[in-house]
C-alpha cells in the first residue's frame, strides 16, 4: 500500500482527532492510519490552551449536568487522567488545582446543599464548603466590594482542594503528545500538516479526498473531527442535511494579577445552553485569573483566520424556514434573548469591561474594571448544532453516520474532556466497518 492510501484517514489534528489517531494506533489491529491537518501544527483552533478553559469537565462542579449525564461524563473524564498518568504528564500538561461550584444567595445555597447530597456518592472526594472554608481557600471570593469586610450574602460551595484530583489540562500540549505516542505503536502512521481537505467522494468502497494544494488521498474509512467544519464537509457530500449550525464564539478577560487559587464556577441557568461565567487560573498567563467565557454567535466557522470561513459558515448553516423557526423560538425566551444581546455588548470597546465586571463580581466582589483586560486572541468557536427534524438545538456532541465508512463529528464543549471516550466509540465503529479488532482488554486496563 502506498503512502497515499490508508485503511483509516482522520481529518483534524485537534484533541478529538489526535485522540482517535492514538486509539486506532494503540488499541486496534489496523495497520495504515493517516492524520491530516490543514494548519502547520496540531491543535491550533479550539484545542489550543487559549481557546478553552483548560478544564477537565468531570461533572462534579458543572451544575448544568444531571446525575445521569455526570456519570457518563465522569467515565470519559477519568480517561484523560489515566492517560496523563501513563505519560507522566503531571505538571506538564495535567495539573491539580482547587475547584468549586459557588452558590450565592439563599436560593442557590439551598440548591447547592441538595446537589451536594445527590452527587457526593459519585464523587466521594467532593466536600461542602461553608463561607468560612471558602474564605480559607479562596479569600477573594469572600472579601466584600469595599475590601474591608466579608461580602454580605449567604454563600456556600461544593468542591475539592488542591492536590486531591486533577482538574486542569493544556489540551493543546496533550494533542501533540497523543500524536507522538500514536507514531510509536509500530503501525504505518502518517501525519500531514498544511493539507486542507476540500473535497470528499466515495467511489465503490474507497473514499477519495482532495486538498486545496492538489494532493489526493485514498482511504477505506474516514473520520472527520474538524469542529464546525465537519458539518460543512458533510453538506458538501450532501450528507447531514437534517442538521444546521450556529457557530458560538467565546471570549475571555484576564486579570493583571492572580486573584483566584483555583477554578470557581457559578450555578448554571438551566434555560441557557451556554456555560455560566467562571474564573480559572490560566496555565499560559502566569496563573493570573481568566474570567469567561462570553457567548456570541458569529458568521464564520473560525474566529481568527480572516474571512475565509464566512462562505463556509453559510454552507454549514443552510438557512431555511426550520432554522429561522428554531432561532426565533430561542429569541422569544426573554432570558436567552437578553443573554445573547448582553454578550454582544461585552465585545464593544469602552463599555465591555464595566459591563463584564458586573457579572464577574458575583465571583470576586472587589473586582474593578481596571483589574481586567480583554484577552485578545483567546477563545474558540463551538458549533451549536440544530436538529432540523426535531426543530431544536442539539445539546452535546453530534455525529453524522448515514454513509457507511465515514463519520462526521461536531463536538461543542466539553468536547476536549470527552475526546478519549468519543475516540473509543469511533474506533469501534471503524473496526466494525473494516472487519478489524478493537483490543477491549488493553483499552480497559489502561484507560478505564
From Swiss-Prot:
The protein's annotated pathway: Carbohydrate metabolism; tricarboxylic acid cycle; oxaloacetate from (S)-malate (quinone route): step 1/1
Pfam family, one: Mqo
Species per Swiss-Prot/TrEMBL record: Campylobacter jejuni subsp. jejuni serotype O:2 (strain ATCC 700819 / NCTC 11168)
Tagged with keyword Oxidoreductase: yes
UniProt KW keywords: FAD, Flavoprotein, Oxidoreductase, Tricarboxylic acid cycle
Record protein name field: Probable malate:quinone oxidoreductase
Cofactor binding description: The FAD is tightly bound.
Flavoprotein keyword on record: yes
Cofactor: FAD
InterPro entries linked to this entry: FAD/NAD-bd_sf, MQO
Reactions accelerated catalytically: (S)-malate + a quinone = a quinol + oxaloacetate
